[in-house]
Amino acid sequence: MLRYRLYFVGLYLCALLYIAAGINHFVNAEMYLRTMPPYLPAHEALVALSGVIEIVLGVALVLRPKTRLRVWAAWGIVLLLIAVFPANIQTYLNMKATADPRLTFALVRLPLQLPLIAWAWAYTRLMPQRPKSR
């Protein structure tokens, strides 16, 4: 029973993280614009699009958590995290070039992408069976 409950607690926390992050793309768009690699076009549109995608994927994780929708949403989050990794690298490079005091945070953020990917990936599989009541 505990494993089943933890599965859903983690699922809802994961969804909340991505919904909040997506909303933050609109509330603090300037922060995300600074992380955009210069080789990408339409920075404003890409920041807004990634915010919408994070919100949609977060909602999809919990909208019907016992269906394939959750699986597809989790795979979407995994792919999104891989896709935005260059922006995390760009943030580090920008901060390194300007001796930004947040450089250490930007450096630590890079390997933190792996546990976030693993967390989302955990929801790409079938959920554990609910234990039968005694």
What does each model-found stretch correspond to?
Residues 1-134:
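Membrane-interface extramembranous regions
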